[in-house]
């Protein structure tokens, strides 16, 4: 389990997060929703171990983040930040392989790379120069890179693993957004990964998430199931914007402007 207890983060005298507590279970997709500046990315950074003052308040599989070496942490969780800048020319296969230092045999590394590329339907990009790809292609390659880091079969995994994604569908068209979230659900269901994803698209969250965290001005406004969170009163309080919630033909809520 990945948990945060009463997270408080200040930067330059400004409170970014106040008493934020969340819990992510293996096999669960948790979406963090909120307006710009709500603290969503900072929360993800805290959960990943990138905010030093928050480490004592975050626990991964029962252990405080402070007790993990960087190598052990890399094998237990993988992080995709909001933007990734690559200034050097790498082949796609080389980039995806970067997180696989713990695998000694090159043939095993290549098998893991191929598996990750196949998940996102980008096998044909394997020998392409990353810098020649479109923004959407680069986004899917970065997703393959972080997912490859955790693709140990569940029977061989020492402990549950966690995937932390910040706006992972940026630059992706409609079809690829849904393809990515189908992969996310597969990772949660088949590999029993816990997934935390920061999102702006409430309809993607409604369709694919198991649990929602509503963050407003650095505080948890509420959290719970999709059905209990995506109701007009809560959404309007979260975004200060009127909405309607309609039933999708397949059962999940669908949010439109009022």
From Swiss-Prot:
All residue ranges annotated as the ABC transporter domain in the record: 2-242
Record keyword Protein biosynthesis present: no
Keywords from the UniProt entry: ATP-binding, Cell inner membrane, Cell membrane, Membrane, Nucleotide-binding, Translocase, Transport
Topological type in the membrane: Peripheral membrane protein
Subcellular location: Cell inner membrane
Residues where ATP binds: 34-41
Coiled coil residues, start to end: none
Enzyme Commission designation: 7.6.2.-
Family affiliation: Belongs to the ABC transporter superfamily. Heme (hemin) importer (TC 3.A.1.14.5) family.
Job of this protein: Part of the ABC transporter complex HmuTUV involved in hemin import. Responsible for energy coupling to the transport system.
Subunit architecture: The complex is composed of two ATP-binding proteins (HmuV), two transmembrane proteins (HmuU) and a solute-binding protein (HmuT).
Designated name of the protein: Hemin import ATP-binding protein HmuV
Protein's organism: Hydrogenovibrio crunogenus (strain DSM 25203 / XCL-2) (Thiomicrospira crunogena)
